[in-house]
Amino acid sequence: MGGAVSAGEDNDELIDNLKEAQYIRTDLVEQAFRAIDRADYYLEEFKENAYKDLAWKHGNIHLSAPCIYSEVMEALDLQPGLSFLNLGSGTGYLSSMVGLILGPFGVNHGVELHSDVTEYAKQKLDVFIRTSDSFDKFDFCEPSFVTGNCLEIAPDCCQYDRVYCGAGVQKEHEEYMKNLLKVGGILVMPLEEKLTKITRTGPSAWETKKILAVSFAPLVQPCRSESGQSRLVQLPPPAVRSLQDLARLAIRGSIKRAMRQEATRGGGLKNTPMFKRRRVRRRRMETIVFLDKEVFASRISNPSDDTSCEDAEEDRREVAERTLQETKPEPPVNFLRQRVLRLPLPDPLKYYLLYYREK
């Protein structure tokens, strides 16, 4: 699936194309897509294809086309504080984007069939938290991934506000999927070759909307153990944040609010331009020679004459460097990090407030 929009040169251009084609229609979804670079979830040797509107698969690792993820994110109608279940969570790309919208008091669970893909998703999540420039701009609901068949979820599991299934669902499993939803919840899944949005309007009432035609690999049927029993998937219990974690969120939130107020008043931090020290160059000199009361102006050879070609070449290099600096965007400044590091606190507490991030 995919190919509905033009390829981009980078992640932002891909998002621009998805917006222009009306696949991305809301600000929250746009912000989430821009915050996480799709290429970060590709293997290094395949990253050149990351900004094409195409699905990608390598072994068990799979990413749907950007236009599909866009429609899914829009159909889920995500809001802060909701609970989300991703069936077939794969690389964790979608779950991480969802986590940016859910915020710190949401629930973000994923079930993945293949254990190697679960580990891949955990590695990508760790890299995002440690190194992404976007992490400090959001309050993140960190995904939790478990391995298992999503058709074998324990019957006593909690229900969710939002559910997405990333594999083709047959009619026989429709009721099973619906029962994972709370009343008022939304389920998005490929049902009989159509991306379908189902809203639970009551204990036994549903509204169904077909979004677009899609082609997904079907759900893998459960394998019975030797005893004939199913291997039930136990989803993570809803986590209760510690007082220490809540204090971290409150402090970071206070700093962010102060920064927004300063920016509104025009007193926020700004990137300071970098100035390059001018190079001092020796110049050729006119030498005055006195001969028998007659004055002659003569240009006497100076060692610097031999460097005239070098000077011209250096001039050209400086012009090229200035041009490159003018066209190259300045690296982003993490103002939140700067503020935290200036707090009158012990270093271990500062690093805790920064989630021990590398930048």
From Swiss-Prot:
SUPFAM superfamilies membership: S-adenosyl-L-methionine-dependent methyltransferases
Biological process annotations from GO: protein modification process
Region (Disordered): 301-328
Region (BC-box): 240-250
Example GO molecular function: protein-L-isoaspartate (D-aspartate) O-methyltransferase activity
Annotated spans, AdoMet binding motif: 85-94, 160-164, 181-191
Residue stretches of biased makeup (Basic and acidic residues): 314-328
Lipoprotein found in the keyword field: yes
Source organism, top-level taxon: Eukaryota
Chain residues carrying a lipid of type N-myristoyl glycine: 2
Subcellular location: Cytoplasm
Keywords: Cytoplasm, Lipoprotein, Myristate
Region CUL-box, annotated ranges: 343-346
Protein family (similarity comment): Belongs to the methyltransferase superfamily. L-isoaspartyl/D-aspartyl protein methyltransferase family.
Purpose of the protein: May act as a substrate recognition component of an ECS (Elongin BC-CUL5-SOCS-box protein) E3 ubiquitin ligase complex which mediates the ubiquitination and subsequent proteasomal degradation of target proteins. May bind to the methyltransferase cofactor S-adenosylmethionine (AdoMet) via the N-terminal AdoMet binding motif, but probably does not display methyltransferase activity.
Domain comment quoted from the record: At its N-terminus, contains L-isoaspartate and S-adenosylmethionine (AdoMet) binding motifs. Also contains an extended SOCS box motif, where the Cul-box is separated from the BC-box by ~90 residues, within its C-terminus.
Name the record gives this protein: Protein-L-isoaspartate O-methyltransferase domain-containing protein 2
Annotated source species: Mus musculus
Higher taxonomy: Eukaryota, Metazoa, Chordata, Craniata, Vertebrata
